[in-house]
């Protein structure tokens, strides 16, 4: 499918235009009485015919087995359109260089360039911005990464084609229009036409004497020199930092700026001068390139300083209530939950926690050197905002929470809201007006269990909801809840949920109902009822 189209698009481009990479062969071919555009399209159509012939052979052989042409024709159309795009992109890469080994490097680099840049930005932000967490790549990044975008659109569980073992498996009940597969192919084919027009123009203007050079055009030299210097300097610089300064400063909430600058500057110099030597085919390149390399190094150092100083205000940003569609919260010593924009009380409580964490960080109370906190505990908090414009903002903090601190008060206020009290007690599907039809109480300590009748399950379920509404649920984040020895499950017609008895307060109605049920007896592993005497 898509992966094979990606591979053969690059390999065929190398084979078809290999004559451009050798001075003798390009001199011979270009001495023939043929226009360059004629040579260009002859090679292109030859490669496309080779790819299509193989696909047609697969279809003909498959027809002998399944005899159903419809799905096979869908597969043929999809794979052919994907191959048109990747062959066009490989052709463009072959026009940009005169060195055969540079073609696959350019081909892979162009396919993943935007994604690689975004990943470097995320890594740099995670090193310098307190609590920063990288989100999924946005739609723009995915569209600029064709092989990933097409693979997602065409090979997922609801896509057009699923390729598992090297040959296409097409299901008759899979619609080729699901997930915008045809639209994505149409867009990339239109882009392929533009790419081929650009490649043809470059082929006409290409200088034959530059065959064998890494850059087939003079303007490609600074692009490659500074592009490799920038990407390589940042990537290798962060890797070097992680294995040197990073290992010695594991408890820092941010990267050590002087160490990061040293690593980035060193790797930028290595990558930039190394690329200059490759482009110039000489070791004597310092006089011609040192000014641009120093400027690039200073620029990357300035970027690191700006990210460390949080010039854009990324670290301090707390989205406004009007911008929030929902917030997903993960917190140690509490269950995960999601608050929607309709629940303004919980939203405001979460925003208060976010502000309290930042204020505590501003005061310097984020030391991670010790595992123990006086009169408190380290709490891990992860917040994922889904905003109304479709974007997302994610933060994760490991902070000391001390009693009487603003953060302690903010977390406890969030835990006392109705939605959070519900998520602490109930896991699964639970609604206040639902009618249970049964349930089970299981002792993890002895292995005994008790099956609940519909009436017993309903009384237990109602008691739990009353405790949630009346606030008979622990709302202190530093309270040790320990482990529960009872597993309580309640089920209805089309739903089921579990009760977490750890979070009920001592006077909760739910605990009283459970105690009454257990006094009436258990069923052991043999199905026999055992009555427990009152203590």
Annotated model-derived regions:
Residues 363-401, 472-502:
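Short, structured surface segments that line ligand/substrate-binding pockets
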């Amino acid at each position: 499918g898509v992966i094979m189209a990606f591979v053969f698009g690059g390999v065929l481009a190398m084979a078809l235009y290999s004559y451009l990479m050798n001075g003798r062969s390009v001199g011979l071919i270009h001495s023939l009485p043929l226009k360059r555009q004629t040579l260009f399209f002859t090679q292109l159509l030859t490669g496309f015919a080779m790819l299509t012939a193989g696909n047609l052979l697969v279809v003909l052989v498959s027809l002998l087995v399944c005899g159903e042409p419809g799905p096979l024709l869908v597969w043929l159309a999809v794979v052919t359109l994907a191959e048109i795009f990747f062959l066009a992109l490989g052709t463009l890469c072959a026009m940009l260089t005169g060195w055969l080994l540079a073609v696959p490097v350019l081909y892979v680099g162009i396919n993943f360039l935007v994604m690689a840049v975004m990943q470097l930005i995320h890594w740099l932000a995670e090193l310098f911005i307190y609590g920063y967490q990288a989100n999924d790549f946005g739609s723009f990044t995915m569209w600029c990464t064709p092989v990933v975008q097409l693979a997602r659109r065409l090979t997922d569980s609801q896509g057009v084609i699923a390729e598992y073992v090297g040959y296409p498996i097409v299901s008759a009940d899979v619609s080729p229009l699901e997930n915008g597969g045809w639209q994505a192919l149409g867009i990339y084919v239109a882009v392929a036409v533009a790419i081929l027009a650009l490649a043809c123009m470059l082929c006409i203007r290409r200088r034959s004497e530059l065959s064998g050079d890494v850059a087939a055009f003079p303007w490609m030299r600074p692009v490659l020199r500074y592009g490799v210097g920038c990407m390589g300097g940042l990537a290798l610089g962060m890797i070097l930092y992680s294995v040197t300064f990073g290992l010695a400063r594991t408890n820092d909430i941010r990267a050590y700026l002087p160490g990061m600058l040293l690593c980035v500057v060193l790797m930028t110099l290595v990558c930039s001068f190394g690329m200059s030597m490759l482009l110039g085919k000489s070791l004597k390149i310092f006089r011609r390139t040192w000014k641009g390399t120093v400027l690039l190094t200073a620029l990357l150092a300035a970027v690191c300083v700006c990210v460390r100083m949080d010039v854009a205000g990324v670290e301090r940003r707390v989205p406004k209530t009007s911008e929030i569609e929902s917030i997903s919260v993960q917190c140690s010593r509490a269950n995960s939950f999601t608050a929607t924009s309709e629940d303004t009380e919980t939203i405001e409580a979460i925003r208060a926690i976010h502000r309290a964490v930042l204020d505590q960080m501003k005061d310097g109370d984020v030391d991670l050197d010790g595992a123990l906190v006086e009169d408190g505990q380290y709490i891990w908090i992860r917040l994922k905002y889904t905003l109304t414009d479709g974007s997302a903002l994610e933060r994760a903090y490991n902070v000391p929470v001390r009693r009487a601190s603003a953060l302690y008060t903010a977390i406890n206020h969030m835990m006392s809201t109705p939605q959070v009290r519900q998520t602490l007690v109930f896991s699964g599907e639970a609604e206040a007006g639902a009618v249970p039809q049964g349930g089970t109480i299981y002792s993890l300590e002895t292995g005994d269990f008790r099956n609940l009748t519909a009436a017993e399950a309903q009384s237990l379920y109602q008691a739990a909801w009353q405790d949630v509404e009346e606030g008979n649920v622990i709302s202190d984040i530093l309270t040790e809840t320990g482990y529960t020895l009872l597993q309580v499950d309640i089920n209805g017609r089309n739903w089921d949920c579990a009760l977490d008895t750890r979070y009920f307060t001592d006077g909760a109605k739910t605990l009283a109902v459970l105690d009454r049920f257990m006094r009436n007896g258990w069923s052991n592993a043999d199905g026999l009822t055992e009555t427990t005497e009152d203590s």
